[in-house]
Design a protein with these regions (language model features):
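Short coil/linker segments at helix-helix boundaries
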Residues: 133-135, 158-192, 196
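Sec-dependent bacterial lipoprotein signal peptides
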Residues: 1-16
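Short, surface-exposed recognition loops and adjoining beta-strand edges that mediate ligand/DNA contacts
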Residues: 34, 61-82, 155, 160-169, ...
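Membrane-proximal, proline-rich intrinsically disordered regions
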Residues: 3, 18-69, 244, 307-309, ...
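Inward-facing hydrophobic residues that define packing positions of alpha-helical scaffold repeats
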Residues: 47, 114-117, 195, 202, ...
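Hydrophobic-face positions in mid-chain alpha helices that act as interaction patches
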Residues: 45, 241-345
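Conserved, well-structured interaction surfaces
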Residues: 85-159, 189, 207-211
């Protein structure tokens, strides 16, 4: 294969945004005990920390996207030296348990998110948080529930067989719904049990979530959108249709599909009209933190050492070229690296 184009703007950028005002409360990435919570501000700070953990390099900031993008048919890896091979283990289906960067790192990071959501949920139910604004506290709890459901959904998509393989009877990942020590090693649940828990968390969160658009935060419509995808993966088509239709029909005042003219320009913007939910990524913080540098840069079309790792496959380009008017032509361009360096023969 000799692909000629590279992604100009990664689809993963769809999860990039949030204004600085969203982080006015100091985000915390570690809330070890219920004693850390005594006010609504403490709870909000902990929730901010959960979103920050999810946007980190080893989750939505980088590694998580490799599992899907690199193992599918639309792109292929450029086999360059050094960190440029960050994507090749996924592309070659050669991710090993001993490879901490590619296996234990994303696993551990997602469970950090789950652990912090459990701490926050327990705190909201403990009575230790003193506030007169119960609605605000309930919404914080609802967002934590939704984030726990999303995190478990992400784990099951990466580390388990699809539900369709055997109707969910294969082993999935451990379900953790209580505040446990990070050294605990719970047993794995089945895929079906995991989907039941995901749906329970997401569904239970809906009643407490706002239907207003909240930049950088989950709201009712975002969770309904996630639920529709969960049901689709579970082969529950009636409920997938019901959840998706709710969003499409009842959120028109907040969200609109991109026009053809808008499409090429939206990927570098925050809070666009079609986006139900976007994570905040810092453009200045190193990618090992909440910086979103990692995922976009593997698609970046530039001659930078150890980046520019993924390019469009020939099959994808052939399909794209069947329609010269396809709007996706506007976000692809010829690779900056000469002679297709690093491509497999």
């Amino acid at each position: 294969m000799k692909p000629l184009y590279i992604y100009f703007l990664a689809a993963s950028l769809a999860c990039t945004s949030c204004s600085d005002s969203w982080l006015d409360l100091n985000p915390s990435t570690s809330v070890p005990t219920d004693q850390a919570f005594s006010s609504l501000e403490d709870a909000q700070s902990a929730l901010n920390g959960i979103y920050r953990l999810a946007s980190a390099h080893s989750y939505y900031g980088d590694n998580f996207f490799y599992f899907g993008d690199c193992r599918a048919a639309d792109v292929q890896a450029r086999m360059t030296k050094g960190d440029g091979r960050r994507v090749s283990p996924y592309y070659e289906y050669n991710v090993k348990a001993t490879d901490s960067f590619n296996s234990s790192l994303p696993w551990n990071q997602v469970y950090k998110v789950i652990r912090q959501t459990n701490n926050l949920i327990a705190a909201t139910e403990s009575g230790l948080i003193k506030t007169t604004d119960e609605a605000a506290l309930n919404e914080i709890k609802a967002q934590a529930l939704a984030m726990r459901g999303l995190a478990l959904y992400d784990l099951i998509r990466v580390f388990a067989m699809p539900y369709s393989y055997d109707n969910g009877q294969s082993l999935g990942v451990p379900i953790v719904t209580t505040a446990t020590d990070q050294s605990s090693k719970p047993a794995r649940n089945t895929v079906a049990e995991c989907y039941d828990q995901i749906i329970t968390d997401l569904t239970n969160s809906l009643a407490g979530l706002s239907k207003e658009k909240k930049d950088g935060c989950l709201n009712y419509w975002a969770v309904q959108g996630i639920l529709s995808r969960v049901y689709l993966n579970k082969l529950d088509y009636p409920n997938a249709y019901k959840a998706a239709t709710d969003v499409i029909e009842n959120s028109k005042s907040l969200y609109q599909l991109y026009t053809r003219d808008e499409y090429p320009t939206v990927w570098g913007k925050e809070y666009t009209s079609e986006s139900l939910f976007e994570f905040y990524f810092s453009l200045t913080e190193p990618s090992g933190g909440s910086g979103g540098e990692g995922a976009p840069m593997v698609y970046a079309n530039e001659e930078k050492v150890d980046w520019n790792n993924l390019i469009l496959s020939e099959d994808y380009l052939n399909l794209l070229n069947e329609d010269p008017q396809d709007v996706r032509h506007c976000v692809t361009e010829v690779s900056a690296i000469a002679n297709n360096e690093g491509l497999p023969e």
